[in-house]
Structures are given as C-alpha cells and as structure tokens.
C-alpha cells in the first residue's frame, strides 16, 4: 500500500486532490511514533494537482492560528505543515491538551502522528484539515467555524467529553496518574492494579452506593437533615395535583415544586405564587420523572435569596458557587429570542467540556416565566434593560456560575462539613438558598434545598465570574498523594519465553507468596501460575490484568510487531529488559519511570543503566541472561 507520487492509483485521494492520506491507525497509548495515544497516518503528494507554495498555505492558516506563523526554522515540508495544523485544529478551540505531534519524512511520503484521545474525533479533524488544504489549493473557502462546531459536538458526546470527566482526565494527565476508559463498564480507571480507583465523573467505586441512593430520595434526606438541626424548607410529598394545591395552601405561597427523583434542576420550579402557577409547575415536575420511577413530587416553602452550591471533597469544604439564571440585556432593537441566539454564539457559550457557560435553552419553563413578566420570546426590550429568563439557576440550561468560595462564613463551612461527614461519598454538593453565604446560617434566611452525590465540578474550575478552584486536584489527591501512589511495579520485556516467564513468577512468589502477579506474553496470560484466557487483542490482555483490583505487579512482553500493530497500553515501566532489541522495540526504553532500570543484551554484551550510571560487561560462557535480570528485578520487590 506504499504509494509514490507518480503512481496512478491513489488510496483515498480524488483526481482533483493535491494530497493523499491513507493507512490511518489509532493507538490508545504510546507507540513507535508518539509517546501518547495517537492517530497515525501516511501523507503524500498525489501528483494530480500542483500544490501551492508552503508559505501560501501558512498565510491562510495563520489567520485562524497565528501562533503557527512564528516557528523557528519554519516548515520544511508540506507534511510538517499538515501535521502541525492537525495538532492545532485538534485542540478544537477549547484548549484540549492534545498538542503533541511528529512527522517522519520518507522519500515519497511521510508518517504523521498526532496526539489523540477519541479516535472518531481525531479522524474527523484529519479529514477536515485535508479538505481545508484541498480548498486552499483550489482557491476556495470553507465554512470553518461550522465545521469546528460539528467536531466539537462529536467530542462532547464522546466518553471523554463531559466537562467533569474531561477535567479529571486532564488533571490526572498533568499529575502523571495513569488513566484509561473501560468501555465495557462505562467507567474511567485511575491507577493500576491494587492502586486503582474506578468511577464516572465524581462518583467512585469507594463511595457507598447506599448513601448515594439516599441522596436521591429528597424527602428522606430532608427529614434526616432536619434531625441534625439544619435548616430545611417545610413541605410534603404529593402524588396528585390536588394534593399539591392542598399542601401549598397549607404552608403558604410562594412554594417550590420539584420531582422527588431528579437531577440538574430539571423539572424544578421555584417561587410559585398561586394555584395556576402550581398546576403548570406540577406538570413540569411530572414530565421530569424517569419512566421507571414512581410519580412523586415535592411541594415545599420557597426560600427567597440567591442559589448556592457548597462542595465538599472527602468530608472537607473546598468550594462554593453562586448560580444565577440566564439573562439577556436589551438593545431596543432585537427580540428576546434574537438576543438569546446572539448570546449563544459567544465564545463563552460554546457548550464544550472547557467552556464556562452552556447554551441558553428555550423551553416551556422559560416561556411561562417570560409570560409572568408580561413578555414573550418575540418581545423587544429597551436598551440596557435586563430580563431574567427563568426562575431556577440551572447551569445546564444556560445559568451563570459565580465563584463564592472566599466569602463563605465559617459557620456555613462547618455546616457543609458536618453534612458531608455523615456520608461515605468522595464528593458531595449541598444546594442552598441564602441572601449571602457571608452571613451565618444561624442568623436565618438560609435553607438547604438538597444534597447531590455526583456534583459537577467544572463550574468551580472555570466559573463565568471569579477565581478558579482546582477541585479536580483535590479529588485526585484524595486517592493519590503522588503519581507513585497510583502505580504498581511494571516489568517489561521485548522478548521472553513462556518457561522464563513462569520462572520469574515463581522467583517473585518465593519472596512474596501473598502477592498477585499478572503476566502476559504473546503465547500465554497468567495470574500467578494459573493460566487465563488469551485475548486475540493483545492490549486487552494487558488492560484486563491492570484492571484486576488485587494485582501487585505486572510482567509484560512487548515485541516489535505488537508495538507496531497496537502500541503499548501503559508507560512508566520500573524495569525494561531488552534482548537484542529491534529499532521499534527500543521505544520501550523511552517510556520508563524516572528511576527505572534498563537492562540490554546485545549478542553477548550486557548493559545495565540505573540511577544515571551504566554498567557494561560480557556474559560468561553458558551464563543465562536470566541471572542478569533476576538480580535487577530483586531490587524493586
């Protein structure tokens, strides 16, 4: 499939194309081309269409990515320019940490590797950049912003695209904590073997599922908080609209209405003033209840004030946020609907995993609230007039987050921590209404609305207003004080026979009989000496071993053909043992832990690199290589 520019048959290119891309391959981890997950592909000229000069492409690209104009030494080839462009576009204008790339130029073609997290998104980026280069060649324009939005949305819908998931994943990468997605389970794993933690967003396997379920039973939870002496609004659970009207009349308007089981403020209506509003609010609450849940709605006294979220991690207060409903400001010319559309086009509301604001959502609740104000989506409001679009400060519907961490009264911090310490949950969000968090809850005017066992955290990391609070770090530091706390010993060979692998397992178990050792080579998979199923996908075997929550140590073989085909699942080996390695297998020596030991055998010559020093000697006649590497393995046990 290697194509030169003079061959007539291309792999993917059309007759009008100047460039061709083929042999696209996605690696989940380190590979021969890049030390991270990557999309790798071949790039060449077709010979059909004469390309522009490199500088002409660069000037157009520089209008969108001016940082590309200032590269020392410039770009030596079309492939190099293409690779850098893919890397820039691949960050999707939302600061993704996917900025690594490489370009290996051959005689007729280049092999390009760009850092990748989600294969489908990365492929879309490559094809978009290819279309862009062809359009520039033909002196045509493309709808750049629209194409970027489509790819942004693709990433946002991926397993990595949720704001909380991405914030934790990126922070783990910075801290050197190994992280990978478990597709069959729909969970993220942080760390290896017995050091691992698994979870999704801010819910982790160490959390009590009983406590987590309890937080969704808003009525019981409220009763529990009341027994602790904390301020909760009075109210009742109702099953019918007539019951709702009766309860509201009993406790007095205004009231708040919300489903017993719900999240993200969906179906919640605050400040309901009369029976007519109550009927509409009750209907919205009913619609928000999942099909598999009973029809139960809370009607409670509405507390006046601002909407706040207090966040605790591991029982400790870490952040607070004020949440305000979305609003628009009139210009005397545009309708409210047009003002919303204009606001939704702003950079801050791109609704990506790294944007501070979501898009403003139009729905029945918005239209009813506008109607209460004597307005509609078609209304044109005066210049400078501010109109709030809903009663509830729902961030997922376009609400605005404002950091309040440093203004919280000490009594309110104690309240949050007292509540959090009654639950075995890593993260706990406490939603409250108050005039200000700077006033003690003991002075009145403070009501706890509900608690949340899976709170979103990106709003604290990137609030619309105020200082950032690095909540992802606080969460990960709950489990891992440093990156070493997330790792088990990893021993990597480029070539090892089954008998030698079994001998190493026995050697380690003699010293640590209570350990669980995982081992894999091209022929077998072991847990201790018990043989396990060998998956045809080699890295699935490695992942399954590292997924084992009892695993103390991993031994893995990575031959060159496996590295070329699948790449390497993990990095950070503690010992790498190379027996007459190929050029490809030498990548194992590049992906070691900082204090790792490298043992290399070339013919009869031995080289051992440890702690910056190199020891070299020749094997004695009939001296086995195992005598060399077993001594080194002993140093990490």
Task: Show where each model-derived region lies.
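Short acidic loop-to-helix transition motifs that present clustered carboxylates
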Residues: 238-244, 435, 560-563
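ATP-dependent carboxylate-amine ligase catalytic core
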Residues: 506-637
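ATP-dependent carboxylate activation and anion-phosphoryl transfer catalytic cores
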Residues: 1-171, 316, 324-331, 335, ...
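Glycine-rich phosphate-binding P-loop
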Residues: 488-510
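Conserved N-proximal alpha/beta basic substrate-recognition cap immediately N-terminal to
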Residues: 113-250, 263, 499-500
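Short glycine-biased active-site loop of nucleotidyltransferases that positions the nucleotide triphosphate
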Residues: 191, 247-249, 311, 439-443, ...
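Extended, charge-rich helix/loop segments that form flexible
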Residues: 339-399
């Amino acid at each position: 499939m290697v194509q030169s520019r003079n061959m007539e048959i291309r792999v993917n290119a059309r007759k009008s194309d100047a460039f061709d891309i083929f042999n696209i391959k996605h690696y989940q981890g380190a590979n021969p081309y890049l030390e991270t997950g990557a999309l790798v592909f071949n790039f060449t000229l077709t010979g059909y269409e004469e390309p522009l000069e490199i500088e002409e492409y660069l000037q157009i690209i520089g209008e969108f990515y001016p940082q590309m104009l200032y590269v020392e030494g410039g770009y030596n080839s079309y492939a190099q320019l293409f690779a850098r462009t893919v890397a820039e576009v691949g960050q999707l204008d939302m600061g993704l940490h996917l900025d690594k790339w490489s370009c290996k130029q051959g005689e007729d073609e280049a092999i390009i590797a760009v850092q990748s997290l989600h294969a489908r998104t990365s492929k879309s980026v490559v094809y978009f950049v290819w279309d862009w280069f062809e359009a520039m060649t033909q002196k045509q324009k493309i709808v750049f912003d629209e194409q970027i939005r489509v790819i942004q949305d693709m990433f946002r819908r991926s397993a990595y695209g949720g704001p909380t998931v991405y914030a934790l994943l990126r922070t783990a990468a910075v801290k050197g904590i190994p992280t990978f997605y478990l597709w069959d389970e729909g969970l993220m794993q942080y760390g290896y073997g017995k050091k691992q933690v698994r979870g999704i967003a801010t819910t982790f396997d160490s959390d009590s599922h009983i406590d987590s379920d309890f937080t969704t039973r808003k009525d019981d939870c409220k009763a529990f908080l009341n027994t602790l002496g904390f301020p909760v609004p009075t109210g009742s659970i109702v099953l019918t609209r007539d019951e709702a009207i009766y309860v509201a009349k009993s406790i007095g308007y205004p009231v708040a209405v919300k489903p017993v089981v719900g999240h993200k403020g969906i179906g919640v209506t605050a400040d309901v003033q009369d029976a007519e509003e109550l009927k509409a609010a009750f209907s919205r609450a009913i619609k928000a209840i999942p099909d598999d849940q009973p029809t139960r709605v809370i009607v409670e006294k509405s507390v006046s004030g601002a909407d706040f979220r207090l966040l605790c991690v591991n029982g400790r207060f870490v952040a607070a946020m004020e949440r305000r409903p979305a609003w628009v400001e009139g210009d005397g010319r545009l309708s409210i609907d047009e003002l919303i559309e204009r606001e939704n086009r702003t950079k801050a509301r791109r609704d990506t995993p790294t944007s501070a604001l979501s898009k403003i959502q139009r729905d029945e609740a918005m239209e009813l609230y506008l109607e209460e104000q004597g307005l509609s989506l078609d209304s044109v409001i005066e210049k400078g007039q501010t109109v709030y679009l809903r009663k509830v400060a729902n961030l997922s519907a376009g609400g605005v987050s404002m950091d309040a961490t440093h203004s919280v009264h000490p009594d309110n911090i104690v309240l949050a921590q007292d509540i959090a310490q009654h639950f075995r949950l890593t993260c706990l969000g406490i939603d409250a209404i108050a005039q200000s968090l700077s006033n003690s809850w003991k002075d009145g005017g403070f009501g706890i609305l509900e608690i949340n066992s899976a709170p979103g955290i990106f709003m604290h990391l990137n609030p619309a207003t105020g200082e950032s609070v690095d909540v992802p770090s606080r969460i990960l530091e709950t489990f891992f004080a440093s990156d070493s706390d997330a790792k088990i010993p990893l021993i990597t060979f480029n070539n090892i026979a089954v008998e030698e692998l079994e001998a190493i397992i026995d050697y380690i178990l003699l010293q640590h009989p209570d350990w669980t050792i995982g081992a894999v080579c091209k022929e077998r998979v072991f847990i201790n000496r018990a043989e396990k199923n060998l998956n045809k996908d080699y890295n699935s075997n490695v992942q399954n071993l590292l997924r084992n929550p009892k695993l103390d140590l991993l031994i893995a073989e990575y031959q060159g053909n496996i590295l070329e085909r699948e790449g390497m699942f993990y990095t950070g080996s503690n010992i790498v043992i190379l027996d007459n390695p190929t050029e490809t297998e030498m990548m194992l020596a590049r992906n070691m832990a900082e204090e790792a030991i490298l043992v290399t055998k070339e013919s009869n010559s031995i080289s051992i690199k440890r702690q910056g020093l190199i020891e070299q000697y020749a094997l004695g006649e009939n001296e086995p290589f195992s005598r060399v590497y077993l001594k080194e393995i002993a140093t990490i046990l």
